[in-house]
Regions:
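Short amphipathic alpha-helical face segments that pack within enzyme cores
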Residues: 38-41, 77, 81, 98, ...
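Oxyanion-binding and handling regions
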Residues: 1-22, 36, 91-202
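DPxDG-like acidic metal-binding loop motif
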Residues: 59-95
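N-terminal beta-alpha supersecondary unit
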Residues: 1-64, 157
């Protein structure tokens, strides 16, 4: 089972292939919201790193936001085209859900988890998670300055993507800085163990 994971939620394009023996191969391109021009090259580079052909992909996972609508559509359309072309199942999850998936118990077990990613201006997307469910609560869009009012640093720790740290004000929080490659491995591991159920797109 080789899983292709595509993310165009941010201004960049990230593609990972997690192989049957749980090796991860990642390509990242800081495309500055020009994913449509770079996504094919990113895929081909990742396939080359993994030493796989497209026909060897058994399932595809694509993130579905939140974020720039055009960027999200590029990733979803690209993933759907591949899925239909190779007759592979296509699944989706939000980027906030993706950030919430850990293969092992996190080190801040005494606090609740929130996934955070920047929106436009001084706003951020936030969602709370627990170990028992992929998504426990509704996603919120709030001002960065209101984060501590809504989610006390004494009660919550934060998961965020590594290349977005500079866009977030997290000084008073315990946090875990996530790498896309590790996130991909954690996601596939959880799916294999049937600990999470993803939405299938058809």
């Amino acid at each position: 089972m080789n899983t292709l994971i595509i993310d165009t939620t941010y201004s960049s394009c990230s593609i990972a292939i997690v192989t049957a023996d749980m090796n991860s191969n990642l390509t990242f391109n800081n495309s500055n919201n020009q994913q449509s021009e770079t996504i094919t090259e990113v895929l081909l580079t990742t396939l080359s790193k993994a030493k796989k052909e497209l026909k060897e992909i058994s399932s595809i996972i694509v993130t579905n936001g939140p974020g720039n609508f055009t960027s999200i559509r590029v990733g979803a359309s690209f993933a759907l085209g591949i899925a239909k072309g190779i007759c592979a199942p296509l699944y989706s999850l939000s980027s906030l859900e993706f950030l919430s998936i850990f293969n092992e118990k996190n080190k801040f077990f005494n606090k609740k988890l929130i996934s955070v990613m920047p929106s436009r201006g001084n706003e951020i997307f936030v969602q709370e998670f627990s170990d028992s469910s992929l998504s426990d609560s509704e996603m919120l869009k709030i001002k960065n300055s209101d984060l501590e009012k809504e989610f006390s640093p004494d009660k919550y720790f934060i998961s965020f993507c590594s290349f977005q740290k500079e866009n977030l004000n997290l000084y008073n929080y315990d946090f875990i800085e996530r790498e896309f490659e590790d996130m991909s491995l954690n996601l596939v591991s959880k799916v294999k163990k049937k600990k999470i159920n993803l939405t299938e797109l058809k």
